[in-house]
């Protein structure tokens, strides 16, 4: 008896037309063969309108793998001018970091000295030039110390480091001087 009453209630609810059924989407009937977009295509010779980067790839170069050593963060750029060095040092000082100069007389890049795998000391640590410049507020002071370093070691590499004494990490490091012929 209960099952017959349930089925009668179900049939009654199906036969009723509700507002929700009036707004239902038509069922999917398959893909239509009529084109939605126009079939004519405008030829455009402008390379920027092409969606693929095929034309742009021809403009790219592969960096030579032999004879081109990479030193620090900005080493893919041409050597920095005096004004560009001053600008980088000013950024370092504005960020609240402490400038520090380091130099290396033999190798200006990370190298593997003791094994085939990179070790802890293999070319990553350079000799510090004097002490970190605590309290330095002017980029000219840092560049003056850089000039003094270059005068003492003209055949060495020099880099400028920005050290954050709160987090106790090195935040910026870039090559400031390469010896002639390097």
From Swiss-Prot:
<keyword id="KW-0602">Photosynthesis</keyword>
<dbReference type="GO" id="GO:0009853">
    <property type="term" value="P:photorespiration"/>
</dbReference>
<keyword id="KW-0113">Calvin cycle</keyword>
<dbReference type="InterPro" id="IPR024681">
    <property type="entry name" value="RuBisCO_ssu"/>
</dbReference>
<dbReference type="Pfam" id="PF12338">
    <property type="entry name" value="RbcS"/>
</dbReference>
<dbReference type="GO" id="GO:0016984">
    <property type="term" value="F:ribulose-bisphosphate carboxylase activity"/>
</dbReference>
<keyword id="KW-0934">Plastid</keyword>
<keyword id="KW-0601">Photorespiration</keyword>
<dbReference type="InterPro" id="IPR024680">
    <property type="entry name" value="RuBisCO_ssu_N"/>
</dbReference>
<dbReference type="InterPro" id="IPR000894">
    <property type="entry name" value="RuBisCO_ssu_dom"/>
</dbReference>
<comment type="function">
    <text>RuBisCO catalyzes two reactions: the carboxylation of D-ribulose 1,5-bisphosphate, the primary event in carbon dioxide fixation, as well as the oxidative fragmentation of the pentose substrate. Both reactions occur simultaneously and in competition at the same active site. Although the small subunit is not catalytic it is essential for maximal activity.</text>
</comment>
<keyword id="KW-0809">Transit peptide</keyword>
<keyword id="KW-0120">Carbon dioxide fixation</keyword>
<comment type="similarity">
    <text>Belongs to the RuBisCO small chain family.</text>
</comment>
<feature type="transit peptide" description="Chloroplast">
    <location>
        <begin position="1"/>
        <end position="58"/>
    </location>
</feature>
<protein>
    <recommendedName>
        <fullName>Ribulose bisphosphate carboxylase small subunit, chloroplastic</fullName>
    </recommendedName>
</protein>
<keyword id="KW-0150">Chloroplast</keyword>
<dbReference type="Pfam" id="PF00101">
    <property type="entry name" value="RuBisCO_small"/>
</dbReference>
<dbReference type="GO" id="GO:0009507">
    <property type="term" value="C:chloroplast"/>
</dbReference>
<dbReference type="GO" id="GO:0019253">
    <property type="term" value="P:reductive pentose-phosphate cycle"/>
</dbReference>
<dbReference type="InterPro" id="IPR036385">
    <property type="entry name" value="RuBisCO_ssu_sf"/>
</dbReference>
<comment type="subunit">
    <text>Heterohexadecamer of 8 large and 8 small subunits.</text>
</comment>
């Amino acid at each position: 008896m209960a099952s017959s009453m349930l089925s009668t209630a179900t049939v009654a609810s199906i036969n009723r037309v509700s507002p929700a059924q009036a707004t239902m989407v038509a069922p999917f009937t398959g893909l239509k063969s009529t084109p939605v977009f126009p079939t004519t295509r405008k030829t455009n010779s402008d390379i920027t309108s092409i969606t693929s980067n095929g034309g742009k790839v021809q403009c790219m170069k592969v960096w030579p793998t032999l004879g081109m050593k990479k030193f620090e963060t900005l080493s893919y750029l041409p050597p920095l001018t005096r004004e560009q060095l001053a600008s980088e040092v000013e950024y370092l000082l504005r960020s609240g970091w402490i400038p520090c100069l380091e130099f290396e007389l033999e190798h200006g890049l990370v190298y593997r000295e003791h094994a085939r795998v990179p070790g802890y000391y293999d070319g990553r640590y350079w000799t510090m030039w004097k002490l970190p410049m605590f309290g330095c507020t002017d980029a000219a002071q840092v560049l003056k110390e850089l000039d003094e370093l270059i005068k003492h070691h003209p055949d060495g590499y020099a880099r400028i480091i920005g050290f954050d004494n709160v987090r106790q990490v090195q935040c910026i490091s870039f090559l400031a001087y390469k010896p002639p012929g390097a």
